[in-house]
Amino acid sequence: MDEIVKNIREGTHVLLPFYETLPELNLSLGKSPLPSLEYGANYFLQISRVNDLNRMPTDMLKLFTHDIMLPESDLDKVYEILKINSVKYYGRSTKADAVVADLSARNKLFKRERDAIKSNNHLTENNLYISDYKMLTFDVFRPLFDFVNEKYCIIKLPTLFGRGVIDTMRIYCSLFKNVRLLKCVSDSWLKDSAIMVASNVCKKNLDLFMSHVKSVTKSSSWKDVNSVQFSILNDPVDTEFINKFLEFSNRVYEALYYVHSLLYSSMTSDSKSIENKHQRRLVKLLL
C-alpha cells in the first residue's frame, strides 16, 4: 500500500531497452489486436472495477470526481523538466524542440452522458476513457511523418493496456535509442494514460519503418483517414520486453485499482452522500 501511495504522489517511470533491429513489420489498418493475459494479467483484475464505475450514471460520476479531476498538466511538466521551449504537432517545415502527439482524452473521464446500467451483463461498451485499448490509433506514429531533427518525440498514450501499445513501444525502442515511459503526478490517476519520451533517433531504422508505412498507406504524408485502430506485428515481441513494460504498467494499474475502489465505495456508501470516509480518503490521496 505504501508503494501505491508513493507512486501516486511522486509518479513512476521506466527506461525501456534499445533494440538495434526492428521487428518484422506488417501494418494493417482498421482493427486492433485483441487483449490477452500475456500482455498484462493485472488489467483483468482492474477492469472489473472499471466496469463497476462504467455502470454508474455519469451525473453521479461528475459529482464524485469533481474535486479530484484536476487539470492534466503532465505534458507541460515534461516540457519544463526537459527545457523544451517549442513543440509542434504537425508540419515538417516547422522548427521545434519536440514533435508531440496527444492521444489522450485530456481532462475528460467519460465519452457521453448516460444513465445507470443495471448490471455488467447490460454493458455493451466502455463509456469511460479508462482501460480502452481501442483508443490507441495509428496517430501514435503520426509524429514520425513530421520528424526532421527534433530532439524529442513525445506521445501522450491513452492507455497502457493491450498488445497494441506494447507492440508500438517495441517499435519505438528501435527507432530511438532512449525511450522512457512516465506516469506523472500531474496526470489523472483515475485514468491509465502515460507519456512516452523518445530521443536520440536511429535514422536507419526510422527510414526503414517509414518506407514500410508509406508503402502500406500509399502516401508519403499523413492522411487523416489513417486515424484508425491498427495492428503492426504478426509475432509477439519477446517476453523480456513485455515484462519490462509490465514492470511499469502494473504499478499504474495497481494504483488505479486502489483509486477506483475508493471511488466506487464512496459512490455506493450507506451515507448516500459525497461526505463519507471513502471520499475523504480519496481526496487526501489525490489532492
Curated annotation (Swiss-Prot):
GO MF term (any one): mRNA 5'-cap (guanine-N7-)-methyltransferase activity
Keyword presence, GTP-binding: no
Keyword Transcription on entry: yes
Cross-referenced InterPro entries: Poxvirus_mRNA-cap_ssu (IPR005009), Poxvirus_mRNA-cap_ssu_sf (IPR043096)
GO biological process, one term: DNA-templated transcription termination
Keyword line: mRNA capping, mRNA processing, Transcription, Transcription regulation, Transcription termination, Virion
Location (main, coarse): virion
GO CC annotation, single: virion component
The family this protein is said to belong to: Belongs to the chordopoxvirinae mRNA-capping enzyme regulatory subunit family.
Name under which the protein is recorded: mRNA-capping enzyme regulatory subunit
Source organism of the structure: Variola virus
